[in-house]
Amino acid sequence: MAGHSKWANIKRQKARVDAKKGQTFTQLSRAIIVATRNGVPDPAGNFQLRTAIEKAKAAGIPNDNIERAIAKGAGTWENDSAFEEIRYEGYGPGGVAILIEALTDNRNRTAAALRAAFSKNGGNLGETGCVGWMFDHKGVIRLEGTIDEDKLLEASLEGQAQSYEFFDSEEEGQGAEVFTEVSNLERLNKVLQAAGFKVKEAELRWIPTNTLEVSDREQARFLLKLIDTLESLDHVQSVTANFDLVEELMLLDL
């Protein structure tokens, strides 16, 4: 049942993991707003909101800010901007597929900023659907600590997980990521916690169905710069791409 995600996140390969997706207080607060609007303002009955709040607390966001974001999402906060979730798609250098999730109150301004970022780094912003078919939307649960594989396999089968993969590095420590269908994320999370696993994070993630191996140093440099530029944009929540650096490039300071 063990699986391996080749993307397994380019940020992991470049030791950028938990600065993870470079999410700022603003981005995390917006995630709470949208999660509230998509469900109910009570985290007990809204798994998306509950996980958004957990991420915010882990990042050190004060409770007052979290409560304010929930109020905005529930429509009980004055002067509230209407944020909407939008997925943008494009190509990086060498035809690498890039998927961007954004929360924005001005889709034209966000699209213009993304288009500029792509064009300055050898890529181009495409039409909706141009690369989306190259990715699967999955629920991902990240476990921490030393893990017994037999125990994980048993819990994964009970929780109807699709696959899992282990990680062990100086930057991340030890643990595993367990993958499942989006609709099964909350159920699997409960099963894994009940089995005694330490759940660090439960999230939805785009996983590339296939990856392109990048061996050219210049292409890799432009790709990483493009990813960094996209992630730094205010309304961008996440960036996923379908490339994998060869080992020699991972050891270089690009």
Swiss-Prot record:
Coiled coil: none
Domain of life: Bacteria
GO MF annotation list: DNA binding
Matching InterPro entries: Integrase-like_N (IPR017856), TACO1_YebC-like_2nd/3rd_dom (IPR048300), TACO1_YebC_N (IPR049083), Transcrip_reg_TACO1-like (IPR002876), Transcrip_reg_TACO1-like_dom3 (IPR026564), YebC-like (IPR029072)
Gene3D superfamilies (alphabetical): 1.10.10.200, 3.30.70.980
Keywords on record: Cytoplasm, DNA-binding, Transcription, Transcription regulation
Keyword Nucleotidyltransferase: no
Subcellular location: Cytoplasm
Gene Ontology CC, one term: cytosol
Similarity section: Belongs to the TACO1 family.
PANTHER family according to UniProt: TRANSCRIPTIONAL REGULATORY PROTEIN YEBC-RELATED, TRANSLATIONAL ACTIVATOR OF CYTOCHROME C OXIDASE 1
NCBIfam families reported for this sequence: PRK00110.1, PRK12378.1, YebC/PmpR family DNA-binding transcriptional regulator
Name of the protein this chain belongs to: Probable transcriptional regulatory protein MAE_13580
Native species: Microcystis aeruginosa (strain NIES-843 / IAM M-2473)
